[in-house]
Amino acid sequence: IKFNKKFSSQSPEQFIKKIIFKKTKCKYLYVSKNFKFGFKRQGNILTLKKFEKKYNFKNIVTQPFKKNNKTISSTFIRKKIRLGKIEEVNRLLGRSWCVIGKVIKGQRRGRKIGFPTCNLKLNDYVVPKRGVYAVKVKSNNFYKNGIANVGYRPTFNGQKLLLETNIFGINKNLYNKVISVSFRKFIRPEKRFKNLEYLKKQIKFD
């Protein structure tokens, strides 16, 4: 499901009809008592109850998941991602938070200094704290460790926010290939280096 302006403008019933009924053919829907959905969060558990029979599903209300007396919601998770608390996010999700996308062409600066990268846009994702992360990268034919940078590449005076990933042991062209980048650990904030030699040394150290 691609989240965009059109998708976010759906009324609660449109969401139920298109996503729950037609797309997923859901029979049992588990939500917390504070669940909100649809345009401007107009839908809630009473809305779901209202349309149960019409769209042939059963709505089951659960208690919010809490840890240390804090409710763990999608809002809470997004906040942690923005703060770079990736290890905590992964523990709470029960899996690694990831970004999936099609590799786009860059300026090949990474390749020129010996560290080729795969570049992904972050348009449809929560933007993690700018910096360097340990990651796992998955494609149709490999699953490799890597190191990724989220940011603007200040050493090169970059203007566009990108996720750049150096995949260990992979040196081939992956343009237009779909890859999944799973975030494992925040290493350090993004920074500007005096020159390329300093940058290369830091990448090797990372």
What are these regions (language model features)?
Residues 9-116, 194, 198:
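Classical nucleotidyltransferase
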Residues 104-206:
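Phosphate/ribose-recognition catalytic cores of enzymes acting on nucleotide-derived substrates
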Residues 1-6, 63:
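A conserved beta-strand->alpha-helix junction
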Residues 2, 33-35, 185-187:
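Short, histidine-centered active-site or binding-site loop motifs used for metal coordination
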